[in-house]
Amino acid sequence: GVSTTTIHRALTGKPGISDQLRTTIQNLAVEMNYQPNLAASALKRNELHIAVLLPEPFLDNRYYYASLWAGIHKFMENAGNFNAVLDEYYYPLLPGAHGEALKSIYQSHLDKIDGFITIGIKENQSSYFIDQFNRAHIPCVILGTDLYGASKLCCVKSHDIMAGNMAAELFTTFLPDQTDRTILLTGNPLGQSAMIDQFYNLNAFQDYLSKTRSPVKLQTAYCTDINQLEEMISPFLSSREVLPYGIYASSARHTVKICEILEKHHLEKQIKIVGNDHFPESIEYLRKGTLTAIIDKKISQQSYTAAKILLEYLSLGRYPERSVMEVQPDILIRSSLSASDN
Protein backbone atom coordinates (compact mmCIF):
# COMPACT_ATOMS: atom_id res chain seq x y z
CA GLY A 1 0.00 0.00 0.00
CA VAL A 2 0.91 3.68 -0.18
CA SER A 3 0.30 6.54 2.22
CA THR A 4 -2.31 9.25 1.72
CA THR A 5 0.58 11.73 1.49
CA THR A 6 2.02 9.82 -1.46
CA ILE A 7 -1.39 9.77 -3.17
CA HIS A 8 -1.75 13.51 -2.60
CA ARG A 9 1.67 14.16 -4.12
CA ALA A 10 0.84 12.03 -7.15
CA LEU A 11 -2.49 13.73 -7.82
CA THR A 12 -1.28 17.29 -7.28
CA GLY A 13 2.00 17.06 -9.18
CA LYS A 14 4.15 17.65 -6.12
CA PRO A 15 7.70 16.26 -5.93
CA GLY A 16 8.84 13.45 -3.65
CA ILE A 17 7.73 10.30 -5.51
CA SER A 18 8.94 8.43 -8.58
CA ASP A 19 7.47 9.09 -12.01
CA GLN A 20 6.44 5.43 -12.30
CA LEU A 21 4.47 5.48 -9.04
CA ARG A 22 2.93 8.86 -9.92
CA THR A 23 1.71 7.49 -13.27
CA THR A 24 0.29 4.35 -11.64
CA ILE A 25 -1.69 6.35 -9.08
CA GLN A 26 -2.95 8.85 -11.66
CA ASN A 27 -4.12 6.04 -13.96
CA LEU A 28 -5.99 4.38 -11.08
CA ALA A 29 -7.62 7.70 -10.23
CA VAL A 30 -8.86 8.04 -13.81
CA GLU A 31 -10.21 4.47 -13.83
CA MET A 32 -12.06 5.11 -10.56
CA ASN A 33 -13.37 8.47 -11.79
CA TYR A 34 -11.78 10.17 -8.79
CA GLN A 35 -12.48 13.89 -8.36
CA PRO A 36 -10.49 15.94 -5.81
CA ASN A 37 -12.50 17.51 -2.99
CA LEU A 38 -11.52 21.12 -3.61
CA ALA A 39 -13.81 22.43 -0.89
CA ALA A 40 -12.08 20.30 1.74
CA SER A 41 -8.66 21.32 0.45
CA ALA A 42 -9.65 24.98 0.51
CA LEU A 43 -10.45 24.77 4.21
CA LYS A 44 -6.81 23.89 4.89
CA ARG A 45 -5.38 27.02 3.34
CA ASN A 46 -5.91 30.73 3.40
CA GLU A 47 -7.94 32.54 0.78
CA LEU A 48 -6.13 32.89 -2.55
CA HIS A 49 -5.87 36.40 -3.98
CA ILE A 50 -5.68 36.61 -7.77
CA ALA A 51 -4.55 39.98 -9.11
CA VAL A 52 -5.87 40.94 -12.54
CA LEU A 53 -4.39 43.94 -14.37
CA LEU A 54 -6.29 45.01 -17.50
CA PRO A 55 -7.52 48.28 -19.01
CA GLU A 56 -10.92 49.46 -17.83
CA PRO A 57 -13.65 48.15 -20.19
CA PHE A 58 -15.07 51.58 -21.00
CA LEU A 59 -15.44 53.65 -24.19
CA ASP A 60 -13.52 52.04 -27.10
CA ASN A 61 -11.78 49.70 -24.65
CA ARG A 62 -15.04 47.86 -24.06
CA TYR A 63 -15.02 46.13 -27.47
CA TYR A 64 -12.03 43.93 -26.56
CA TYR A 65 -11.33 44.29 -22.85
CA ALA A 66 -14.90 43.82 -21.65
CA SER A 67 -14.68 40.30 -23.07
CA LEU A 68 -11.42 39.64 -21.23
CA TRP A 69 -12.97 40.76 -17.95
CA ALA A 70 -16.13 38.74 -18.66
CA GLY A 71 -14.23 35.48 -19.14
CA ILE A 72 -12.39 35.88 -15.83
CA HIS A 73 -15.56 36.82 -13.97
CA LYS A 74 -17.44 33.86 -15.45
CA PHE A 75 -14.80 31.41 -14.25
CA MET A 76 -14.67 32.93 -10.78
CA GLU A 77 -18.46 32.78 -10.44
CA ASN A 78 -18.23 29.00 -10.77
CA ALA A 79 -15.00 28.54 -8.82
CA GLY A 80 -16.23 28.71 -5.24
CA ASN A 81 -14.40 25.50 -4.36
CA PHE A 82 -11.07 27.21 -4.99
CA ASN A 83 -11.55 29.67 -2.10
CA ALA A 84 -10.20 32.52 -4.23
CA VAL A 85 -11.02 36.18 -4.75
CA LEU A 86 -10.14 38.68 -7.47
CA ASP A 87 -8.13 41.81 -6.81
CA GLU A 88 -8.89 44.00 -9.85
CA TYR A 89 -6.46 46.65 -11.08
CA TYR A 90 -6.86 48.98 -14.06
CA TYR A 91 -4.56 51.13 -16.14
CA PRO A 92 -4.97 53.56 -19.08
CA LEU A 93 -4.01 52.47 -22.60
CA LEU A 94 -0.98 54.73 -22.86
CA PRO A 95 2.65 53.93 -23.63
CA GLY A 96 4.45 52.85 -20.46
CA ALA A 97 1.27 52.72 -18.35
CA HIS A 98 1.22 48.93 -18.10
CA GLY A 99 4.75 48.77 -16.70
CA GLU A 100 4.01 51.56 -14.24
CA ALA A 101 0.91 49.73 -13.02
CA LEU A 102 2.89 46.52 -12.55
CA LYS A 103 5.52 48.46 -10.62
CA SER A 104 2.89 49.99 -8.34
CA ILE A 105 1.31 46.61 -7.58
CA TYR A 106 4.71 45.04 -6.98
CA GLN A 107 5.76 47.78 -4.56
CA SER A 108 2.46 48.10 -2.67
CA HIS A 109 0.64 44.75 -2.86
CA LEU A 110 3.28 42.06 -3.34
CA ASP A 111 2.54 40.39 0.00
CA LYS A 112 -1.22 40.35 -0.65
CA ILE A 113 -1.44 38.37 -3.90
CA ASP A 114 -0.86 34.71 -4.81
CA GLY A 115 -1.17 34.80 -8.60
CA PHE A 116 -1.37 37.28 -11.45
CA ILE A 117 -3.22 37.65 -14.77
CA THR A 118 -2.41 40.44 -17.22
CA ILE A 119 -1.93 41.09 -20.94
CA GLY A 120 1.36 40.81 -22.79
CA ILE A 121 2.81 44.26 -23.38
CA LYS A 122 6.12 44.30 -25.22
CA GLU A 123 7.82 46.94 -23.11
CA ASN A 124 10.95 46.53 -21.01
CA GLN A 125 9.39 47.57 -17.71
CA SER A 126 6.45 45.20 -18.19
CA SER A 127 8.72 42.21 -18.80
CA TYR A 128 10.97 43.23 -15.91
CA PHE A 129 8.21 43.28 -13.30
CA ILE A 130 6.64 40.04 -14.53
CA ASP A 131 10.07 38.52 -13.89
CA GLN A 132 10.12 40.11 -10.44
CA PHE A 133 6.75 38.58 -9.57
CA ASN A 134 8.07 35.20 -10.64
CA ARG A 135 11.14 35.60 -8.41
CA ALA A 136 8.75 36.35 -5.55
CA HIS A 137 7.03 33.00 -6.33
CA ILE A 138 3.90 34.66 -7.72
CA PRO A 139 2.98 32.90 -10.98
CA CYS A 140 1.72 35.03 -13.87
CA VAL A 141 -0.52 34.03 -16.78
CA ILE A 142 -0.28 36.36 -19.77
CA LEU A 143 -3.18 37.07 -22.13
CA GLY A 144 -3.33 38.12 -25.77
CA THR A 145 0.33 38.22 -26.77
CA ASP A 146 3.24 36.16 -25.53
CA LEU A 147 6.26 37.81 -23.95
CA TYR A 148 9.08 35.60 -25.13
CA GLY A 149 11.72 35.27 -22.44
CA ALA A 150 9.51 36.56 -19.63
CA SER A 151 9.15 34.25 -16.63
CA LYS A 152 5.46 33.44 -16.85
CA LEU A 153 3.49 30.33 -15.92
CA CYS A 154 2.03 30.34 -19.43
CA CYS A 155 0.44 32.52 -22.10
CA VAL A 156 -3.13 32.13 -23.39
CA LYS A 157 -3.72 33.81 -26.74
CA SER A 158 -5.51 33.55 -30.03
CA HIS A 159 -3.96 31.67 -32.93
CA ASP A 160 -3.26 34.98 -34.68
CA ILE A 161 -1.70 33.45 -37.79
CA MET A 162 -4.75 31.26 -38.27
CA ALA A 163 -6.99 34.33 -37.85
CA GLY A 164 -5.20 36.19 -40.64
CA ASN A 165 -5.21 33.15 -42.92
CA MET A 166 -8.93 32.59 -42.37
CA ALA A 167 -9.75 36.19 -43.24
CA ALA A 168 -7.65 36.10 -46.42
CA GLU A 169 -9.26 32.85 -47.53
CA LEU A 170 -12.73 34.29 -46.89
CA PHE A 171 -12.03 37.18 -49.25
CA THR A 172 -10.43 35.16 -52.04
CA THR A 173 -11.97 31.67 -52.15
CA PHE A 174 -14.84 32.57 -54.47
CA LEU A 175 -13.00 35.06 -56.66
CA PRO A 176 -12.07 33.96 -60.20
CA ASP A 177 -8.32 33.35 -60.51
CA GLN A 178 -7.71 36.36 -62.74
CA THR A 179 -9.91 38.79 -60.83
CA ASP A 180 -8.13 42.08 -60.24
CA ARG A 181 -9.58 43.37 -56.97
CA THR A 182 -8.32 45.56 -54.13
CA ILE A 183 -8.52 44.73 -50.44
CA LEU A 184 -7.84 47.41 -47.85
CA LEU A 185 -6.15 46.35 -44.60
CA THR A 186 -6.82 48.45 -41.51
CA GLY A 187 -5.46 48.13 -38.01
CA ASN A 188 -2.40 48.89 -35.96
CA PRO A 189 0.41 46.43 -36.80
CA LEU A 190 2.42 47.70 -33.83
CA GLY A 191 -0.54 46.78 -31.66
CA GLN A 192 -2.50 48.80 -29.14
CA SER A 193 0.03 50.10 -26.60
CA ALA A 194 2.69 47.60 -27.72
CA MET A 195 0.54 44.46 -27.99
CA ILE A 196 1.67 42.78 -31.20
CA ASP A 197 -1.18 40.33 -31.89
CA GLN A 198 -2.36 42.43 -34.84
CA PHE A 199 1.12 42.29 -36.37
CA TYR A 200 0.91 38.50 -36.69
CA ASN A 201 -2.71 38.67 -37.85
CA LEU A 202 -2.02 41.15 -40.66
CA ASN A 203 1.23 39.46 -41.68
CA ALA A 204 -0.59 36.14 -41.99
CA PHE A 205 -3.23 37.75 -44.22
CA GLN A 206 -0.54 39.03 -46.58
CA ASP A 207 1.43 35.77 -46.47
CA TYR A 208 -1.66 33.80 -47.46
CA LEU A 209 -2.17 35.93 -50.57
CA SER A 210 1.51 35.57 -51.44
CA LYS A 211 1.56 31.79 -51.02
CA THR A 212 -1.63 31.32 -53.05
CA ARG A 213 -0.38 33.77 -55.70
CA SER A 214 -3.62 35.68 -55.51
CA PRO A 215 -3.99 38.55 -58.01
CA VAL A 216 -5.67 40.63 -55.29
CA LYS A 217 -4.03 44.01 -54.71
CA LEU A 218 -3.46 45.13 -51.14
CA GLN A 219 -3.69 48.66 -49.80
CA THR A 220 -3.11 49.60 -46.17
CA ALA A 221 -4.56 52.17 -43.79
CA TYR A 222 -2.69 51.55 -40.55
CA CYS A 223 -3.00 53.97 -37.66
CA THR A 224 -2.50 54.14 -33.90
CA ASP A 225 -5.11 56.90 -33.55
CA ILE A 226 -8.49 55.50 -34.56
CA ASN A 227 -9.79 59.03 -35.19
CA GLN A 228 -7.42 59.32 -38.16
CA LEU A 229 -8.94 56.36 -39.95
CA GLU A 230 -11.72 58.13 -41.88
CA GLU A 231 -9.30 60.66 -43.34
CA MET A 232 -6.88 57.87 -44.29
CA ILE A 233 -9.42 55.79 -46.19
CA SER A 234 -11.35 58.67 -47.80
CA PRO A 235 -9.36 58.39 -51.08
CA PHE A 236 -10.62 54.81 -51.43
CA LEU A 237 -14.23 55.92 -51.00
CA SER A 238 -14.22 58.95 -53.29
CA SER A 239 -15.73 57.28 -56.37
CA ARG A 240 -17.12 53.95 -57.51
CA GLU A 241 -14.04 53.41 -59.69
CA VAL A 242 -11.67 53.27 -56.70
CA LEU A 243 -13.87 51.44 -54.18
CA PRO A 244 -12.07 48.42 -52.72
CA TYR A 245 -13.60 44.98 -53.11
CA GLY A 246 -13.22 44.44 -49.38
CA ILE A 247 -11.83 45.80 -46.12
CA TYR A 248 -10.20 43.70 -43.41
CA ALA A 249 -10.18 45.25 -39.93
CA SER A 250 -7.68 43.46 -37.68
CA SER A 251 -8.90 44.82 -34.34
CA ALA A 252 -12.18 45.27 -32.51
CA ARG A 253 -12.03 49.06 -32.50
CA HIS A 254 -11.07 49.22 -36.20
CA THR A 255 -13.98 46.91 -36.95
CA VAL A 256 -16.46 49.29 -35.33
CA LYS A 257 -14.90 52.39 -36.88
CA ILE A 258 -14.91 50.95 -40.41
CA CYS A 259 -18.57 50.01 -40.06
CA GLU A 260 -19.43 53.51 -38.83
CA ILE A 261 -17.57 55.14 -41.74
CA LEU A 262 -19.11 52.96 -44.44
CA GLU A 263 -22.62 53.42 -43.06
CA LYS A 264 -22.03 57.18 -42.97
CA HIS A 265 -21.12 57.09 -46.69
CA HIS A 266 -23.90 54.56 -47.51
CA LEU A 267 -21.33 52.09 -48.81
CA GLU A 268 -21.90 49.21 -46.41
CA LYS A 269 -23.67 47.10 -49.06
CA GLN A 270 -21.03 47.74 -51.72
CA ILE A 271 -17.87 46.70 -49.86
CA LYS A 272 -17.30 43.39 -48.11
CA ILE A 273 -16.06 43.89 -44.56
CA VAL A 274 -14.46 41.23 -42.38
CA GLY A 275 -13.83 42.29 -38.80
CA ASN A 276 -12.39 40.84 -35.63
CA ASP A 277 -13.88 39.75 -32.31
CA HIS A 278 -17.29 38.87 -30.92
CA PHE A 279 -18.90 41.68 -28.90
CA PRO A 280 -22.37 43.30 -28.94
CA GLU A 281 -21.57 46.01 -31.50
CA SER A 282 -19.86 43.64 -33.95
CA ILE A 283 -22.73 41.16 -33.70
CA GLU A 284 -25.24 43.93 -34.44
CA TYR A 285 -23.25 45.04 -37.51
CA LEU A 286 -23.13 41.42 -38.68
CA ARG A 287 -26.84 40.91 -38.06
CA LYS A 288 -27.83 43.91 -40.21
CA GLY A 289 -25.37 43.08 -42.98
CA THR A 290 -22.77 45.82 -42.60
CA LEU A 291 -20.21 43.18 -41.66
CA THR A 292 -19.83 40.24 -44.01
CA ALA A 293 -18.09 38.06 -41.42
CA ILE A 294 -16.28 38.16 -38.09
CA ILE A 295 -13.09 36.37 -37.10
CA ASP A 296 -14.09 35.36 -33.58
CA LYS A 297 -10.87 34.99 -31.59
CA LYS A 298 -12.87 33.87 -28.53
CA ILE A 299 -11.52 36.55 -26.22
CA SER A 300 -13.59 35.59 -23.19
CA GLN A 301 -12.61 31.94 -23.63
CA GLN A 302 -8.95 32.99 -23.52
CA SER A 303 -9.33 34.77 -20.19
CA TYR A 304 -11.57 32.02 -18.76
CA THR A 305 -8.85 29.51 -19.62
CA ALA A 306 -6.18 31.72 -18.07
CA ALA A 307 -8.06 31.95 -14.77
CA LYS A 308 -8.66 28.19 -14.76
CA ILE A 309 -5.00 27.41 -15.40
CA LEU A 310 -3.82 29.76 -12.66
CA LEU A 311 -6.27 28.50 -10.01
CA GLU A 312 -5.58 24.85 -10.79
CA TYR A 313 -1.86 25.50 -10.50
CA LEU A 314 -2.16 27.33 -7.17
CA SER A 315 -4.70 24.91 -5.67
CA LEU A 316 -3.72 21.55 -7.15
CA GLY A 317 -0.16 22.02 -8.34
CA ARG A 318 -1.39 21.23 -11.86
CA TYR A 319 0.88 22.67 -14.55
CA PRO A 320 -0.45 23.91 -17.91
CA GLU A 321 -0.06 21.56 -20.87
CA ARG A 322 2.09 24.04 -22.79
CA SER A 323 3.85 27.33 -22.18
CA VAL A 324 1.70 28.94 -24.90
CA MET A 325 -1.95 27.93 -25.20
CA GLU A 326 -3.43 29.06 -28.52
CA VAL A 327 -7.22 29.28 -28.84
CA GLN A 328 -8.38 28.58 -32.39
CA PRO A 329 -10.62 31.29 -33.88
CA ASP A 330 -13.96 30.70 -35.59
CA ILE A 331 -15.70 32.42 -38.48
CA LEU A 332 -19.05 34.02 -37.73
CA ILE A 333 -21.50 34.83 -40.53
CA ARG A 334 -25.04 36.09 -40.18
CA SER A 335 -26.67 32.68 -40.62
CA SER A 336 -24.52 31.25 -37.83
CA LEU A 337 -25.81 33.69 -35.22
CA SER A 338 -28.04 32.27 -32.52
CA ALA A 339 -30.90 34.03 -30.81
CA SER A 340 -28.69 34.44 -27.74
CA ASP A 341 -26.12 36.57 -29.57
CA ASN A 342 -26.45 40.22 -28.55
PLM feature spans:
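Flexible loop/hinge segments that line or gate small-molecule binding clefts
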Residues: 121-162, 279-287, 291
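Hydrophobic alpha-helical segments within soluble ligand-binding/sensing domains
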Residues: 155-182, 229-233, 282, 298-315
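Hinge/cleft segment of the Venus flytrap/periplasmic-binding protein
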Residues: 32, 193, 209-212, 298-342
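N-terminal helix-turn-helix DNA-binding module of bacterial transcription factors
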Residues: 1-46
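Hydrophobic alpha-helical
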Residues: 105, 115-135, 205, 216-283
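Amphipathic helical "hinge" segments at domain boundaries
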Residues: 35-101
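Short, solvent-exposed amphipathic alpha-helices that sit
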Residues: 63-80, 163-167, 193-216, 257-261, ...
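Short beta-strand elements in bilobed, periplasmic/extracellular small-molecule ligand-binding domains
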Residues: 76-98, 181-184, 202-227, 243
